[in-house]
Amino acid sequence: MNKLLELIENAKNIAITGHVSPDGDCTGSTLALYNYITENFEGKQVRVCLEKPSKKFLYMNGFDLISEDPFSEADLLVSLDASDRERLGSRGVMLDTAKESICIDHHVTNTNFAKFNIVEDFRSSTCELLYTLLDYNKISVNTAVCLYTGIVHDSGVFKYQSTTRQTMEIAGALIDKGFDFTKIIDDTYFKKNFNATRLLGLVLTNAKLIFDGKCCYGLLDYDTWTGYIDDKKKMDGIIDNLRNIDGVEIALFMYETAKDEHKVSLRSINADVSAIAAALGGGGHMRAAGATVHGKADELLENTILPMIKKELNG
């Protein structure tokens, strides 16, 4: 029995959490573990404490039970897909109140902030890592759907360099549990509503190509994007469209979340964008990273972010 299952076995009240602005991997891993525990362990009080994810993940069993509030009575905290305490947001306080804590993560920038830490940065996703810690014979269809979703999203539908033979084998084993895997990919990764598609077109129309075509960036202020969509999560995927432009090595997408506050997303083909994100106070992976920055957008770009990108491109 590995450390995760040992801690679950010995706990009564369990809180499962993940990073702020939960994506497919964070949502999938937290709900996968929730389903696995509730289906295989008796007498456990389990709560998923997480910012409400995008409604496109409503199909995952347990989605409607997610609570944004900390679970103060938890004697075990399981953190999934978060690289440091700050990424847990207000739910980070549970690290102080829970008797035991364990972090399961695949980010190279992980700070080993929990009492116990299982971090494997070579994994495509936290869902892939979590799969290796669970008993396959006890993985239900509900759990498999969650795990598969996370792997699909963090591997870029199996096209990022973090995808390995084992990633594909695990995905295949999950598909064997029996669910419509093509619908998951289509509905949660590719499909966008009309206004979100129009917003994507606006970003691409106004995007800038610099540094001999090796960097492409797009910007949105708060009033612009809120004029098209009601949820920032509907901008997921814009950064990938910038990265997919021929010749681009590093893509940048920055949008305003509040006055003088901006979310920065970075993607690359070969360059290490995690170092750039870390310098900006964020984190992530070598090929996919992000941060939240404060200041005027044009000043941040000209004085800080673009010089960092140029330096990384020049080696």
Predicted regions and their residues:
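Short glycine/serine/threonine-rich phosphate/pyrophosphate-binding segments
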Residues: G24-T30, R85-G89
